[in-house]
Amino acid sequence: MADKKALIALSGGVDSAVAALLMQGQGYELTGVTMRLWPRSRCCDEKDIEDAAEICARLGIPYTVLDYREAFRRQVVDVFVAEYQAGRTPNPCARCNQFLKFDALLAEGEKLGATMLATGHYARLAETSSGTALLRGRDHAKDQSYFLFAIGAGILSRLRFPVGGMNKDEVRAMARKHGLPVAAKQDSQDICFVPDGDYRRFLEDYAGLDMAQEGEMVDSSGQVLGHHPGTLHFTVGQRKGLGGGSDQPRYVLALDPAQNRVIVGGEDELYRGVVSLAECNWLTDLSPGETHAVTVKLRYRSRAESAMLHLLSDARAELRFREPQRAVTPGQAAVCYQGERLLGGGWIQGTE
């Protein structure tokens, strides 16, 4: 039956391996797939592919590697570079889910007659009177719903997140019980195409950007306080690299790449109460003009904070926080929840 055929996206890690095991236990006819997203010489993905292939061999399911390097470069990596050039701090994992991963894998599944796609994300799904809802993973320490805010609402009913109701210890225990070779494999922590975490070196080596473009360091009134080595070295909230010469610590308040300026100020100037969003995506029925009480995550690891969500148009919204938020960073995602349910979110454009 077509509704029992599914693709399982395999990263080579323990979460997707256990997701495959659980889907198989539910009677799904699976095909394992891994997306090759970056040149072999620049990202350590070969071991992950070997691990994914071994998982499929253990489970007795077919496995294939899909080449999406060009699409990934165009839709994710080049946007990553452009965002830094524009003075923003990008979130490539959410962008990849938004523009590439889920839609592409569902399309690949259709070629094989598979209507469902399963992944190892820590998130949950629930059926409601208005359709399928996306919920936070039960293990809030591992919850990955933040990265899924921008996927299409129309595909939720075709997704499965088998480990979303488990915690990490339970996942590893199940992998050990069933003899999966990745039971103790360490989780990946960095951006997949910047495996050493040094984004500055990546911008220099991959994009050929000149990181040494000295400019003025100014305060919020425009007074010149000194000079900086280049805006690409900084992000909002950063203290390191600003030099001394002040009785009070200075922090980056904003970047102005057009004028090659870094705007700095004291700790108290980092706080903002109003955040404007663009490219919004909502996973439930919300309409322009509406206002909703929500909790918001401004970064993946941040705590969800109370705010009022004002919907300005289909693609634009404004958040007014109960308490001012520290170092709100343009280019990052603001993701909105009501209780456990993810409503959606948008990309941070500006603050007040």
UniProtKB/Swiss-Prot annotation:
State the UniProt keywords alphabetically. Answer: ATP-binding, Cytoplasm, Disulfide bond, Nucleotide-binding, RNA-binding, Transferase, tRNA processing, tRNA-binding
SUPFAM superfamilies given in the database record: Adenine nucleotide alpha hydrolases-like
InterPro entries in the record: MnmA-like, MnmA-like_C, MnmA-like_central, MnmA-like_central_sf, Rossmann-like_a/b/a_fold
For the ligand (ATP), the binding residues are A9, L10, S11, G12, G13, V14, D15, S16, M35, G120
Q: Quick check: keyword Ligase in the entry?
A: no
Cellular compartments annotated:
Cytoplasm
Annotated active site: C96 (nucleophile), C192 (cysteine persulfide intermediate)
Q: Which cysteines are joined by disulfide bonds?
A: C96-C192
* Catalysed transformations (reactions): S-sulfanyl-L-cysteinyl-[protein] + uridine(34) in tRNA + AH2 + ATP = 2-thiouridine(34) in tRNA + L-cysteinyl-[protein] + A + AMP + diphosphate + H(+)
Protein name (Swiss-Prot/TrEMBL): tRNA-specific 2-thiouridylase MnmA
Q: Which organism is it from?
A: Acidithiobacillus ferrooxidans (strain ATCC 23270 / DSM 14882 / CIP 104768 / NCIMB 8455) (Ferrobacillus ferrooxidans (strain ATCC 23270))
